[in-house]
Amino acid sequence: MENLTRELRKADISLCLDFVMNHTASTHRWAMAAKAGDATYQAYYHCYDDRTIPDQYEQTVPQVFPNTAPGNFTWCEEMHKWVLTTFHDYQWDLNYANPAVFVDMTKSILHLANLGVEVFRIDAVPYIWKQLGTTCRNLPQVHTIVRMLRMVLECVCPAVILKGEVVMAPKELAAYFGTPEKPECHMLYNVSTMVNLWGALASRDTRLLKAQLDALHALPDNCWFVNYLRCHDDIGWGLDEAVENRLGIDPQKHKEYLYHFYEGNFPGSWAKGELYNYDPATGDARSCGTTASLCGVEQ
């Protein structure tokens, strides 16, 4: 890693590394120790002997992948315990209510910074704090943890940048910058603009995009967005429903139009995307595809 970052720096390239905040792999050494019965490392995760507490969580916590990874908990035969797994059964959610987790995660990021990593793309940030009776998304404690991490970095390696991967509703996004007095992420992916660009292209209506850009321009100067067209993730059609309603757009019908358009299942569509995670109960779905496929280059 040191050799890589050294060579990159010679070419004026800063290395950006993905740093997953919410979970570890089930094969990570912490998880393996937990499976072996080490109570210290079992406390690094959310482990339960029976379904009492997991069932309480399931009442309020949405499922990320209801079709491919239903439920938010996985049974671990080695421990004879249920483990919180928000995304997939092989991704164990960390328990930040245990201070040792924050300490060890901070040690990990500082170790990588010492090896020359200059930008950290902190992944799945909104999910890192769990609290019964909530959606376990965007809770106040999440912002406290990100702020603490930023404070440590500013003290130890102030040139390091935190780039937040926050795939949430527009109203939740800007909060991850913090405030000028209490900053959190240096940069955020501009998810809302990406979604609204594709929405405007399919609908040939720029009103939602303009409203979203107007809201961005009203943010303080410390808000630094990374604009992009596509990435490895699907497109979740999380448009601002309040703005849609104000403009006379039916949010559900508009969403259905967009994901059908981008799978090529609509008259006049040029796209060759794929429908992803369709939920017939809610009518919700996401869209997958490269920029070329969604723009109709294959046609």
Regions found by a protein language model. Name each.
Residues 1-299:
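Active-site and adjacent substrate-binding regions of carbohydrate-active enzymes
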